[in-house]
C-alpha cells in the first residue's frame, strides 16, 4: 500500500469527513447553456430534478457534488467522445489534474439543471495501470479491475481472442479515459483541445471513439433498432420514491458507489475511494445488415402475418422488446407504440406468468440480462445490477450495405455500441451478467442457449473454438422446443478496459498530489 506523508494523509481524512459544502466548487465562469445537453427519450425513466435529487440524497447521505456525473445519469447523451490516453509525464499530469482539469470535471449535481450544466460535460476514469502510473497502489478490492480486461476477455467475456480488438486495447498502455459529452461534436472537440493544451504533452492518445445518438425517431435506439437503457435501476438516494417507475428495480447506493450502503467491501476499501465507481468500457461492433438478413431468412410463419411482420416478430423475440420498446411479455404478437412510450407501463412486467415461452423466450436478450421474476423479482438480486451509460457510434447503414446484406469493411463505416456500465464490484456486476447469465447455455433453463443477440459462437460448444454455430431454443412461439442455429456473431468485441471513476474529492486530495 502506498504510504502518504502526514500532511497528505490528514488532507485525505479531512476531505473524506468534511461536510457536503466543502466539496462545492466556486461557480465556473465559463459560458453556460440555455438548453439541456442531455436527451430525454420518453420511453426511459426520467431523471430527477435538482431539487428532487437534493432531497433524496440528503436523506441517504449521498454527496452529489462529489460524484462524477456520468455514473448515475445513465444513457442520456447526444454526442460523447471517449478519449483513451497513456500518461507519459506523471508529475505534470498530476499537477495539471489538480490545478486545471479538476474544475472541468462535471458532477452529478451539475448535470441535473440546465442552469448549472457546462457547454461540454467532462468526466475522467483510470485503469489499474493508470492509477499505478500516478503512484496509487492502494487495493480497491476488485481483482477483475486490478487484472484488466485483457486478462479475462476470453475466459469470462467469451471473446474469441483479441484478433478483432482495437490495437490500443491490447496491452496495458491505456491509463485513462476522458468522457466528453455535449450536443455538438464541435463543442466536444473544442473541450478536448482545451484539455490537451492544459496537460501540456503529459499524455499520449491511444484511441478515441466518437459516440452519437442516432437521428430522428431513432434517438435512444442502438443500431439494431432497439431502445436501450430502459431497465436501468433506480438508486436509493438519487431517485425520489415517487419517481420510481413500475417494474424498475430500486437498489442501495453501494451497488454503484464504493463505500456506500451495501457495497460488498464497504469497510475494506481505502477511504479516498468512496463515491467512486468502476466503469466497464467495451467497443461492440454491431453487424446490423447481417442481423436484418438473418431475420428475413428466418422470419416466423404466423397466421395472418406477412414475411416482414414475421421477421419483426423474430427480432422482437430475440431481444424481448419490439423496436418501439414495447415488451413482448405484455404484447407478444403485435407492436404497441403507445405502450412503449408510456414509462409507467413499458417496464412493468416480470416474466412470472410465462412458463411456456409463448410470450417471452427464455433466451431473449432482456430476459437473459435481467431475469426479473425468474429469480424471484427485480429486487431479489441487487448485486447483479449495473447502470448502463453507453451510446451508439458510427454512421447509419448505407444503401450499399443494405443491398449486399453485409457490413462494409471500410473502417469509417464501422458502427456499434460504445458500451459503458457502472458498478461497485465488476465481478458481481458486469462479469456475472455476461458469464453466468448471457453466455450460459443452461440459464435459466437447461438447453436455453446463449443470448441470441450478443452471445458469441465461440462459447456455445463449451470450447473457445471460433465459428461454432450457437443453437438457441424458444424463439418460435408455436414450437418452444424447436431450435434456431445462428452461424454469425451479430456483435463483435473490439476490446475495452476496466476503469475506476473517482470522486472529485479523491482527484483533489489523492490523484493529483
Swiss-Prot record:
This is Dye-decolorizing peroxidase msp1. InterPro entries: Dimeric_a/b-barrel, DyP_N, Dyp_perox_C, Dyp_peroxidase. Its main location: secreted. Keywords: Heme, Iron, Metal-binding, Oxidoreductase, Peroxidase, Secreted, Signal. Residues 1-20 form the signal peptide. It catalyses: Reactive Blue 5 + 2 H2O2 = 2,2'-disulfonyl azobenzene + 3-[(4-amino-6-chloro-1,3,5-triazin-2-yl)amino]benzenesulfonate + phthalate + 2 H2O + 2 H(+); 2 a phenolic donor + H2O2 = 2 a phenolic radical donor + 2 H2O. GO terms for cellular component: cytosol; extracellular region. Homodimer. Manganese-independent peroxidase that is able to convert a large number of compounds, but its physiological substrate is not known. In addition to classic peroxidase substrates (e.g. 2,6-dimethoxyphenol), oxidizes dyes such as Reactive Blue 5. Also degrades beta-carotene. It comes from Mycetinis scorodonius.
Amino acid at each position: 500500500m502506498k504510504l502518504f506523508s502526514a500532511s497528505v494523509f490528514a488532507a485525505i481524512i479531512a476531505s473524506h469527513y468534511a461536510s457536503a459544502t466543502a466539496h462545492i466548487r466556486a461557480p465556473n465562469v465559463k459560458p453556460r447553456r440555455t438548453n439541456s445537453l442531455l436527451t430525454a427519450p420518453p420511453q426511459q425513466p426520467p431523471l430527477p430534478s435538482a431539487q428532487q435529487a437534493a432531497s433524496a440524497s440528503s436523506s441517504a447521505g449521498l454527496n452529489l457534488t462529489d460524484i462524477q456525473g456520468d455514473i448515475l445519469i445513465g444513457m442520456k447523451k447526444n454526442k460523447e467522445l471517449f478519449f483513451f490516453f497513456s500518461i507519459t509525464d506523471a508529475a505534470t499530469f498530476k499537477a495539471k489534474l489538480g490545478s486545471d482539469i479538476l474544475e472541468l470535471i462535471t458532477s452529478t449535481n451539475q448535470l441535473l439543471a440546465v442552469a448549472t450544466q457546462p457547454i461540454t460535460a467532462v468526466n475522467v476514469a483510470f485503469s489499474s495501470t493508470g492509477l499505478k502510473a500516478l503512484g496509487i497502489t492502494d487495493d480497491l478490492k476488485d481483482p477483475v479491475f486490478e487484472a484488466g480486461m485483457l486478462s479475462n476477455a476470453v475466459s469470462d467475456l467469451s471473446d474469441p481472442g483479441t484478433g478483432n480488438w482495437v490495437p490500443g486495447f491490447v496491452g496495458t498502455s491505456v491509463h485513462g479515459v476522458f468522457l466528453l459529452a455535449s450536443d455538438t461534436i464541435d463543442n466536444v472537440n473544442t473541450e478536448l483541445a482545451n484539455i490537451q493544451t492544459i496537460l501540456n504533452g503529459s499524455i499520449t492518445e491511444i484511441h478515441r471513439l466518437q459516440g452519437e445518438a442516432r437521428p430522428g425517431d431513432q434517438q435512444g435506439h442502438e443500431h439494431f433498432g432497439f431502445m436501450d437503457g430502459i431497465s436501468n435501476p433506480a438508486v436509493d438516494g438519487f431517485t425520489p420514491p415517487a419517481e420510481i417507475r413500475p417494474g424498475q428495480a430500486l437498489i442501495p447506493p453501494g451497488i454503484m458507489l464504493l463505500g456506500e450502503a451495501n457495497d460488498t467491501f464497504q469497510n475494506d476499501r481505502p477511504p479516498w475511494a468512496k463515491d467512486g465507481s468502476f466503469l466497464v468500457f467495451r467497443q461492440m461492433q454491431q453487424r446490423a445488415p447481417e442481423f436484418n438478413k438473418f431475420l428475413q431468412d428466418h422470419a416466423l410463419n404466423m397466421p395472418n402475418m406477412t414475411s416482414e411482420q414475421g421477421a419483426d416478430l423474430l427480432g422482437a423475440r430475440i431481444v424481448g422488446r419490439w423496436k418501439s420498446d414495447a415488451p413482448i411479455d405484455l404484447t407478444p404478437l403485435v407492436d404497441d407504440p403507445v405502450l412503449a412510450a408510456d414509462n409507467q407501463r413499458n417496464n412493468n412486467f416480470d416474466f412470472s406468468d410465462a412458463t411456456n415461452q409463448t410470450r417471452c423466450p427464455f433466451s431473449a436478450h432482456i430476459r437473459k440480462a435481467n431475469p426479473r421474476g425468474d429469480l424471484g423479482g427485480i429486487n431479489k438480486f441487487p448485486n447483479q445490477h449495473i447502470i448502463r451509460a453507453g451510446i451508439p457510434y458510427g454512421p447509419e447503414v448505407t444503401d450499399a450495405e443494405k443491398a449486399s446484406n453485409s457490413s462494409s469493411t471500410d473502417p469509417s463505416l464501422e458502427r456499434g455500441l460504445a458500451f459503458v456500465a457502472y458498478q461497485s464490484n465488476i465481478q458481481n456486476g458486469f462479469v456475472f451478467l455476461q458469464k453466468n447469465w448471457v453466455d450460459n447455455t443452461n440459464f435459466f433453463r437447461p438447453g436455453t442457449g446463449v443470448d441470441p443477440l450478443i452471445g458469441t459462437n465461440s462459447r456455445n460448444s463449451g470450447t473457445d473454438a471460433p465459428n461454432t454455430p450457437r443453437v438457441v431454443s424458444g424463439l418460435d412461439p408455436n414450437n418452444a422446443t424447436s431450435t434456431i442455429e445462428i452461424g454469425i456473431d451479430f456483435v463483435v468485441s473490439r476490446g475495452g478496459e476496466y476503469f475506476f471513476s473517482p470522486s472529485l474529492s479523491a482527484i483533489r486530495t489523492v490523484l493529483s498530489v
